[in-house]
Regions:
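Bacterial signal peptide processing site
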Residues: 6-9
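A bilobed periplasmic-binding-protein/Venus flytrap-type ligand-binding module shared by bacterial periplasmic
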Residues: 44-46, 110-121, 210
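Short beta-strand-to-loop elements that line the ligand-binding cleft
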Residues: 56-65, 82, 154-165
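C-terminal motif of bacterial Sec signal peptides marking the signal peptidase cleavage site
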Residues: 2-4
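Pocket-lining segment of extracytoplasmic ligand-binding domains
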Residues: 86-87, 156, 161, 167-210
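Flexible hinge/capping segments at coil-to-helix
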Residues: 17-23, 114-130
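Short beta-strand->loop
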Residues: 31-35, 128-138, 146, 150, ...
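Short, polar/charged alpha-helical segment
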Residues: 24, 28, 34-68, 72-74, ...
């Protein structure tokens, strides 16, 4: 995931030209992020903001999909957004550079889970249903790459079922008795494992990628 940063009319070079001795003027900044690990990385900022420990005043918009705030980011109604890297790249091009990538805030949070103990490598995914999220974004591209590099056709050898939220994919895995698997990010991995003792981490996507 990348953090894409946009600017509005108040974020102009005038502020940068002020003398360093001048008093800092607090600004109102709206931050948008996706549910799950993307937003969890902002918990301290959220807490500090509530306790009036931040230099600026922040408001937060947490959504299930980046589409819910991309238009506002381009318009400048949202100043900071955490979203998939491909979405950030698209916005950079659409906005002619007005929206730019400033950092990566999540790494190594994807795992493949099963509830039968039958999956020990990527090849074991062949013929299975895979529940996941992020159609058209980083999770889908990552999954397709891993399958292809292990000789599995993502469109023929497996059935990838995309859900709008990770919690839905977790529920489908927990209720499945057909050997289905799910690719989920933390903290949903921990949540589903705590709720169902049969569910385990079968593959660490980061290690498989490496």
């Amino acid at each position: 995931m990348f953090t894409a940063c946009g600017s509005n009319s108040s974020d102009k070079s005038d502020n940068a030209t002020q003398e360093s001795t001048s008093e800092y003027v607090s600004e109102d900044i709206k931050v948008a992020a996706l549910k799950g690990p993307t937003a969890i990385g902002m918990v301290k900022l959220m807490s500090d903001n509530e306790d009036n420990k931040t230099a600026n005043n922040y408001t937060f918009q947490i959504e299930a999909a980046a589409d819910a705030f991309t238009a506002d980011l381009i318009k400048g109604d949202v100043q900071i957004a955490a979203m998939p890297c491909n979405a950030a790249a698209t916005l950079y091009n659409k906005s002619n550079g007005k929206v730019s990538v400033v950092g990566i805030n999540t790494l190594g949070v994807l795992y493949i889970l099963d509830n039968k103990g039958e999956v020990t490598n990527v090849s074991d995914l062949k013929g299975r249903t895979i529940y996941t999220t992020g159609k058209g974004t980083t999770p889908e591209y990552t999954l397709r790459y891993l399958l292809n590099t292990n000789g599995i056709d993502p469109d023929k050898d497996v059935h990838i079922e995309f859900k709008s939220e990770a919690s839905e994919a977790a529920t489908m895995l927990a209720s499945s008795d057909s050997g289905a698997v799910a690719m989920l990010p933390q903290p949903y991995v921990t949540t589903v494992m705590a709720a169902n003792s049969d569910v385990r981490i079968a593959l660490d996507v980061t290690k498989e990628w490496e």
